[in-house]
Amino acid sequence: MHKLVVAAALALLASSSAYSQNAAPGSARLMTSLPADSGTVTNYYKQNVYDPSDNKIGEIVDVLVDQEGRVNALIIGVGGFLGAGEKDVAVPFSSVRGKKKDNKWWLVMNTTKDALKSAPGYKYDSTKTQWVPEKS
């Protein structure tokens, strides 16, 4: 359920910020083509992240956007087995790059699984509808 809410929020944030900046009140701005440098959230959300040696180091569990609708951080689940014992950490969006490998979209980060495991943990607080630091 949380994932559906996040996807809907991303769509709402992106559309509302674009609307408020580029359109006059009461008029809808429609696109006749897509920006050449655009990507999709689905290329990141719920995707595995690998180190430069192609070892899986985690999975993206959330995509964070600023008030302008720009992606600025990713929450990556690291460690654990089938979600049990997993730790969620935050990384800057710019630290993950995408590449094509074997005709698939791969996300690569120049770090190790151990480095991610040692990073501060975060948990999703549904009452605040945001990620907050885990208490030690």
Role assignments for model-derived ranges:
Residues 2-8, 17-136:
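Peripheral interaction segments used for macromolecular assembly
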Residues 11-12:
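Repetitive helical segments and hydrophobic/amphipathic motifs
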